[in-house]
Design a protein with these regions (language model features):
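Nucleic-acid endonuclease domains
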Residues: 1-80, 89-173
Length: 173
């Protein structure tokens, strides 16, 4: 019951963010990466969403550079019902999540910048607002198993605090 209430409230907040975005922004072409400078365009997209959140009077904290969940605990009145938002950008139809998997407690705003092709249909610029659980769909169980395996290997080989093999390296940290 509590998780359902939290999810429903989060979905309403996210819909209001989507609606405000559509009211404020009609063209996303200014977010296109120029000359391979992805960090500049990423900062622009975060600033756009920040202006939407501020326009709605929402409170939030921002993640540091290269951390997941660009906006954490986004809320209006009740902080414990806050949502997490991750901003993604892509030119085509593939979204890269690097080392984090989508989950139902993260809402995604995906800027699809579009792509023109000579032979097949072009991909039009668009913005997708979606919950992480909708992204993973029926693959949820497999992804959970995958994440457990990855965490096991990270603990064994890469996390010194877990007292695994990483502590045995002499020339690597």
């Amino acid at each position: 019951m509590v998780l359902s209430l939290r999810f429903n409230h989060g979905s309403r907040v996210f819909r209001s963010i989507r609606d405000k975005f559509e009211e404020m922004i009609s063209d996303i072409s200014f977010l296109k990466t120029e000359g391979g400078n992805t960090q500049t365009s990423e900062r622009k997209s975060i600033e756009v969403i920040k202006s939407v959140l501020d326009g709605l009077g929402l409170k939030y904290s921002e993640a540091g550079s290269q951390q997941s969940k660009d906006f954490r605990s986004v809320y209006k009145n009740v902080k414990s019902l806050g949502i997490n938002i991750e901003i993604k950008k892509t030119n085509g139809l593939t979204v890269y999540f690097n080392d984090t998997l989508p989950t139902e407690d993260i809402y995604y705003i995906i800027f699809v910048m579009g792509k023109e092709y000579k032979v097949k249909d072009n991909i039009l610029p668009q913005v997708i607002f979606i919950n992480g659980s909708d992204l993973i769909g029926p693959d949820k169980t497999l992804l959970r198993e995958y994440q457990e395996d990855i965490n096991y290997l990270k603990d064994k080989w890469g996390r010194k605090k877990c007292f695994g093999k990483a502590n045995e390296f002499t020339n690597f940290s």
